[in-house]
Amino acid sequence: MSREFSLLRRSVGPVEPSRLESPEEPPLRTLLHLSDIHFGPKHLPAVSAGVVELAAARRPDLVVISGDLTLRAKPVQFREARAFVAELERIAPVISVPGNHDVPLYRVWERLLQPFGAWRRHFDRELEPVFRDDEMLVAGVNTAQAFALKGGRIRRRRLAEIDTLLAEAPAELFRIVVAHHHLIRPPGVESEHPAWNAGEAIARWGPGRVDLVLSGHLHQTLELRPFGEDGFLALHTGTTSSSRGRGPESGRNSLHWIEIGHGSFRVERHFWESQSGRFEIGLDQRFRRRPPR
């Protein structure tokens, strides 16, 4: 049995809420997780405006964007994405990592020589940002690459850097890793290969090390726990504001609202409802936190 298949076989669902602290307990931190915004021909302006409205109403402590802010990494798409992120930054800090669509596709020389030049000009020269406060550590991983059109890769250098970040962080911090590409091939999606070195990342971020891995790329929402309750939750957001939803989420847009508590964390899956013109909760789950070690 392959390691990948065994991980999927051992994945489990949410922990029963009755075994955790009261859902009414005020959260320590709140996050808004977005992905696959895709400014360009497939972008839905009304939906991205709804994202800003939700953020303004709920005031997260941090906004996390796991890549693909553009469709084809064109200058106009980056300018539109920058304006969108600027609106969010007026509400909360924003941490984002590139996706494969944020690397130029047809501008071959730029792709080979400066694949992240446009990203750095519009967002941050740091492609793998880190956010840290008294309650959480969020580490970005750039899985996009110049020499692959779709697939991703986790660089071993970054794995070593995250090892150091985790070792130096206080044990009680809630630990989050953000990457565009997925670590585990989801059931029934045979064409989507995990990022290179995903198996090594899973092993390094296993029980007692990381609480949550946030990703996108698949354009479907998904939750997997490769080590059961003792390990991290791999949480995928679908496409937040484009018409490129896939599979059962074709034509749908999603995001996640995350509340970090003392012994657990809550994940609200939101879907855009065109009739109401806003994001509404489609699923509300609570998961056990990693015990401090």
Task: Cite the ranges covered by each PLM segment.
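N-terminal active-site segment of His-dependent metallophosphoesterases
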Residues: 2-86, 161
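Extended active-site neighborhood of metal-dependent phosphoesterases/phosphodiesterases
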Residues: 22, 79-161, 169, 204-206, ...
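Active-site environment of divalent metal-dependent phosphoester hydrolases
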Residues: 40-43, 71-75, 80, 98-108, ...
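Conserved beta-sheet core of the metallophosphoesterase superfamily
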Residues: 190-262
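A short C-terminal boundary segment appended to hydrolase-like catalytic domains
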Residues: 260-293
